[in-house]
Amino acid sequence: CYKGPTTTLPTPDTPRSVAVSIRQFFDLYANVRPIKTFPNQVGPLGEVDFVCVREGTEGLYTGLEHRLSDDCAISIRKITRRACTRIARYAFDMAREKGWKKVIAINKGNILKETDGFFLKIVEDVARNYSDVEWEPYFIDNFAQQLVKNPQRFNQNIAMSTNLFMDVISEEASGLIGSIGCVYSANIGDKYAMFEPAHGSAPKYKGMNKVNPTATILSGAWMLDYIGEKQLSDAIFKATYDVIAEGASVTYDLKGKASTSEMAEAIADKAKAILTQS
């Protein structure tokens, strides 16, 4: 399915996150965000090309929170062998499929010795079945620092972690390509998948026709590839990259002056031309 941005209120006794609920209901355990510099949009830290893989069904996002008293609340971090095994396999399989050589397991095992220690042990066990792919544990604080000092060290790597850690890291990584409006994502399970732009909602821009449509368009294109419409998907991806490279019909966050609809129409026109020629 395809899901657009929604707002989740931060107060107790309000509805849960739509995305989190869908991931858990349909067991969409792999939240995947490609982080790749777009043409003509190289940021101050240079070109990047890696993938963030996030376990999407448990961790601190299981909703196991309790108010013990007026002065104390707790949240339970759930880490299971099943979830760790399948997200590790997904990351290693993706690295192998892409011909990349390393999976990075982001953790805080020196402090969270039980939960992250368990996670790392399972990753190590899974890694034994992938002799062609290296793996490296990385403390989350160090990874976050290196991501803004020398992000190229992670190029052609799969960065993988538990739910909350990778939620934060993938947002930080999105800044490396200039705009969260360019980051598309997929939530993959064994039977179902959900595709969505990585960014949340932005009610302050309602009706202004100014936000970047790239993530929305490319999430849909990725869904087309998932359901077997590779030719259509490839045409939309190429058209989007071409429009951004040309720079004439892009939104303000990409240093342009186009509206949302103008950029979307430019991509649609170019995709139609590509399909007509093929």
Short names for language-model regions:
Residues 146-248:
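Glycine-rich phosphate/nucleotide-binding loop
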Residues 69-142, 155:
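Glycine-rich phosphate/diphosphate-binding loop of Rossmann-like nucleotide-binding domains
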Residues 20-38, 129-139, 182-196:
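Short, acidic/small-residue loops that bind anionic groups at enzyme active sites
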Residues 1-74, 164-168:
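N-terminal glycine-rich phosphate/adenylate-binding segment common to multiple enzyme folds
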Residues 98-107, 130-138, 229-235, 245-257, ...:
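Flexible, glycine/charged-enriched surface loops at secondary-structure junctions
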